[in-house]
């Protein structure tokens, strides 16, 4: 199966597993997906992840996080910059998601960062996704 947008597939797999209240989800690995997963872990949206090599590209197993009463930690995931319509912003125009309650994930020259980290480093880039 050929994917035209592997990042959208990554976000959709997490969104679907989260909505179905699965404990974990397995996603084909890539360097960008590993960076996105690390940001989700740092920001507290997922419990943990593990990368296993399968002889091809590898698999990322993400353990999802839920509240004490089973409520979802991830309320929403939205792909912003798509292959058909890229969305670039300067450091001055970095978006705030829900007035700071969510995060924007930005691909910059300094790597893949959250909107807050990009503001601190004063770099702009391509807005990959919003997570709240």
Curated annotation (Swiss-Prot):
Gene Ontology BP terms: translation
Subunit description: Part of the 30S ribosomal subunit. Contacts proteins S5 and S12.
UniProt key word Transmembrane: no
Name of the protein in question: Small ribosomal subunit protein uS8
Key word RNA-binding present: yes
Family: Belongs to the universal ribosomal protein uS8 family.
Function: One of the primary rRNA binding proteins, it binds directly to 16S rRNA central domain where it helps coordinate assembly of the platform of the 30S subunit.
Xref: InterPro entries: Ribosomal_uS8 (IPR000630), Ribosomal_uS8_CS (IPR047863), Ribosomal_uS8_sf (IPR035987)
A cellular-component GO term for this protein: ribosome
Alphabetized UniProt keyword annotations: Ribonucleoprotein, Ribosomal protein, RNA-binding, rRNA-binding
One function term, GO molecular function aspect: structural constituent of ribosome
């Amino acid at each position: 199966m050929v994917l035209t947008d592997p990042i959208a597939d990554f976000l959709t797999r997490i969104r679907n597993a989260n909505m179905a209240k699965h404990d974990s989800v397995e996603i084909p690995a890539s360097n960008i997906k590993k960076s996105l997963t690390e940001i989700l872990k740092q920001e507290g949206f997922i419990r943990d992840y593990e990368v296993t090599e399968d002889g091809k590209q590898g698999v990322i197993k993400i353990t999802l996080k839920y509240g004490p009463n089973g409520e979802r930690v991830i309320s929403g995931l939205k792909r912003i910059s798509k292959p058909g319509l890229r969305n670039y912003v300067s450091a001055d125009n970095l978006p705030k998601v829900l007035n700071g309650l969510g995060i924007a994930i930005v691909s910059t020259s300094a790597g893949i960062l959250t909107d807050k980290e990009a503001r601190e480093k004063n770099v702009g880039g391509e807005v990959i996704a919003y997570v709240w």
